[in-house]
Amino acid sequence: MTEAFYTDKSRVRASFDRAAATYDRAAVLQREVCDRMATRLDLIRHAPARVLDAGSGTGYGAGLLRARYPEAQVTELDLAPSMLRASRDKQLPQGRLRRLFARAPALVCADLEQLPLASGSLDMVWSSLALQWLNTPDAVLAEFHRVLRVDGLLMFATLGPDTLKELRQAFAGIDGATHVNQFIDMHDMGDALVRAGFATPVMDVERIVLTYDEVKAVMRDLKAIGAHNATAGRGRGLMGRQAWQRIEAAYDRLRQDGRLPATYEVVYGHAWRPAARPRRKLDDGRDIIEFHPHAPA
């Protein structure tokens, strides 16, 4: 990833903080991806006692997890405190007295790359559309591996490089700034899982296309969910009218059946934390790597 595409984490936090009040009205894609992730759980045999929703937003995914695993402790973790407050307000009952005696949900405001959780303390980590806000997956996957117990499950969805390809195309050549975040390829994500020590990773990808009447509606939806451009190479000033008209004209050429497409490439994956293999060493400190060739047919 080039320096221009590095994500400014403080801007990510500020953007989602501002969007907390409008997020649920615009988060159509986010809810759909959570629902599809939950459907994938039907194919996995796992009964977790402690679950982390990593990048929980306003709590939609955590609600699905609590419904599926009613005996489990589900902890919501997000970088933006206003998102967590929105989730808390939805869960607590109305009325001051009832709230006083209600059980508060488990909420943690923290960075995914520095989880304030004990090693081996979780049976499952769920993360829906949060990993794309990180510069590389390695640090966060190492943290997920650390906090999971042996045989713990990691399940996630993130965005692939074809996401918002129409918007990227419309902005191409306007100026030297970056206007759309860069997203990691599915195969690179699978490689990162293996590097982090996860076993039997399963990956798949699908494309979800939302449609709009005009370019401004695309931008309004992105703003409403807090999905601002947070790259280091973003423009710092306001865009002029002529530049914006060129963007609208370029995007309008992509219109299909009277509607403007906005493509999201959604990458799904799950993997397990295996038991650590004992490492054998020679007297001089070199590792022993066992090799068992197959017998010839």
From Swiss-Prot:
Organism: Laribacter hongkongensis (strain HLHK9)
Pfam families linked: Methyltransf_11
Name this polypeptide is given: Malonyl-[acyl-carrier protein] O-methyltransferase
Keyword S-adenosyl-L-methionine in annotation: yes
Purpose: Converts the free carboxyl group of a malonyl-thioester to its methyl ester by transfer of a methyl group from S-adenosyl-L-methionine (SAM). It allows to synthesize pimeloyl-ACP via the fatty acid synthetic pathway.
EC assignment: 2.1.1.197
NCBIfam families: BioC (TIGR02072)
Catalytic activity entry: malonyl-[ACP] + S-adenosyl-L-methionine = malonyl-[ACP] methyl ester + S-adenosyl-L-homocysteine
GO molecular function: carboxyl-O-methyltransferase activity; malonyl-CoA methyltransferase activity; S-adenosylmethionine-dependent methyltransferase activity
Biological pathway: Cofactor biosynthesis; biotin biosynthesis
